[in-house]
Design a protein with these regions (language model features):
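Residues forming the Rossmann-fold NAD(P)(H) cofactor-binding site
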Residues: 18
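Glycine-rich Rossmann-fold phosphate-binding loop(s) that bind the pyrophosphate
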Residues: 12-15, 36-37
Length: 168
């Protein structure tokens, strides 16, 4: 098992965690950030950003469909009906998420922050273990910032379904 010591350990690379890690790195502190998924958190990877991209695509499709109607709209006409190819829309959304994720990772790197992929398991108040067995990494820090985000909760009076969606 390898051991890594640092001044600041941030657990969670969502909007709270990566901003804290970047700032610590900018201030010259030896900083490590641990993320179990992709840098950017729920908002960037599967929540706000991808949702807004899909809403924008739906709005654009709706506007184009109006132009495709007989006679067009605003003097703009499109021959034939507007067509949505969902696989193309999803690929476009995924490209946005990938680009922003790479941007967050670049900001961390440029600030001198080490990004470790994995799930942090506390061994004591200032030590975490990532991974298992001989490949595990033990990180000991002087300071620990918990920025592990949130998880969606289904409310008993508002079940997930056709009109209620979750980021999961």
């Amino acid at each position: 098992m390898k051991t890594r010591n640092c001044k600041v350990l941030v657990i969670g690379a969502g909007p709270g965690g990566y901003v804290a890690a970047i700032r610590a790195g900018q201030l010259g502190m030896d900083t490590v950030i641990v993320e179990g998924q992709r840098a950017g958190g729920t908002c960037l990877i599967r929540g706000c950003i991808p949702s807004k991209a899909l809403i924008h695509a739906a709005h654009t499709f709706h506007k184009l469909a109006g132009h495709a109607k007989k006679g067009g709209h605003m003097g703009i006409s499109i021959p034939g009906p507007a067509e949505l190819k969902m696989e193309g829309t999803i690929a476009w959304k995924d490209a946005i998420v990938d680009r922003l994720n790479k941007g967050v990772e670049a900001l961390l790197k440029n600030a001198g922050v080490e990004l470790v992929h994995g799930w942090a398991e506390f061994q004591d108040a200032k030590t975490v273990k990532i991974g298992k067995g001989k490949d595990a990494l033990l990180i000991q820090a002087e300071n620990v910032i918990l920025a592990n985000g949130s998880i969606p909760v289904e409310l008993p009076f508002m079940k997930y379904g056709e009109h209620v969606l979750s980021s999961k």
